[in-house]
Every structure is written in C-alpha cells, then in structure tokens.
Amino acid sequence: GRMKNCISAINFLGQYLLATGENAYVFPDSFAPYRYHPHPYVFTDEELSRLFAAADSFPYCPQSPLRHKIVPVVFRLIYTCGLRPGEGRALKKRHINLDTGEVFITDTKFDKDRLIVMWDDLVSVCRKYDEPRAAATSFRKSEYFFPAPGGNCYSRNAFSQMFQQCWKAANPGIHNLPRVRVYDLRHRFASAVLNRWTDEKRDLYAMLPYLRAYMGHYDLSATEHYIHLLPDNLVKSSGVFWAAMESIIPEVKENE
C-alpha cells in the first residue's frame, strides 16, 4: 500500500545516508503494515459448470429487477475475458460494441487502458441480455452496462455477495467450502491460457507479453506469477481444458 511505499522510500534514503557515514534511522521490516494476500483459487471445469448453472438460476429480486439477468452475464464476461472484477461491474454501455464484440477497458488499475474482443458466443449472450436492459425504463439513463438499482454500478461488496450466493448454491449441503473470490475467475482464465500454451508446446515466457497486454498487467512479474501457480494447478485441477470454456456459454438461438 501507500504507507509501505513511503517506508521503503524513507529506508532507501536512510541506507544511503548510513553508507555515506551520516547518522540515520532505518525502519525494521516488522514496522511495515501487514497486508493479507489471499491465495488464488483455480476452479476446476466441474466447479465452473456448477457455478454458472447457479448463476443462470439466480433468483429474481423485485428491489433489483435486472439483477438475475446481470449475474449470469457479468461473471461469464469476467471469466472468458480475464477481467478484474471492477472492470466488469463498472463497464459502461459506450465501451462495449455488440456488433464487433469489442470491449474497451478504461479507468483501470495502473491506468493501462486496453481493447479486448469477446468470443462470438459471449457476444450473443450479451446481446440477449441487452434487450431487457434497454427495455427497463428505470435503467435507461444509466451509463453502466450492468446497472444497480439507482443507475450506478454495483458496489464491490454487493458484487461479492452475489458471487458468494452463486458459489453456495452451486455446492448445496457442502460445509467448509473453499474460500473463493470473483477475482479467482481471472486467475482461472490466466491458468487456462497457460495450460493451453503448455499443451501446444509453446514457450511460455515468449508468450507472456501477449497475456500481459490482454490482462492489463503493469509489468511481466504480475503475469509470471501465474506460471508459478501452474504445477499446483495441474495436480489439483486435472480436468482443466481450454475447450471446456465453451460449455459454460449457453446456446443463444438466432431469434432470441
């Protein structure tokens, strides 16, 4: 965080002064605030199928009449495009082109705007969702593609609660479920891409710049992190196949 960066800068100056023979104080490592970093959870194909089936059956809420239609679409968008949760829930109408499938991701972490293209099946899903969204008079003035009641985008907490509701519904009667976050959909996306490249015998480090650009990482170190997850992922998630991504996109007929 910001405080940790400030302490690092002060320590750097202190170490320089000490090296030149001046008196200076250097903060001990224990002084920096501890920041919890949850371990990424990589969903199996079976878990994803159950999760999206639960999203498809998300209950209707009269206080939020569009929510049950938003949930199945926004979580698929985050997963299949590898978005950060905030990029999905705060997506604006003017930044998604349902004719070309292009999605402009802006106002992002590290200010790295990027243009991505959705799968054709996902474009069809978004078009089907856009019909009731556009017809809902209470949301017409909202600039967001996934509007919450009142026209703003969903808060981070509300978004997380909807995801947890889907996760629990996907695993009825199971106690002590693994702790998962919306962000884990992005982790699974990256792992699936790397798994595919591994199967294709590609040089992962040569391909990393492409994944880095697509996911909007600031530098390669963030992208390299997913390679370190791969061995554990391959052991625990033996059924991870890239082609299985297609199975979570519901078929949309031409007239729907």
Give the label of every model feature segment:
Residues G1-E256:
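Conserved catalytic core of the tyrosine transesterase superfamily
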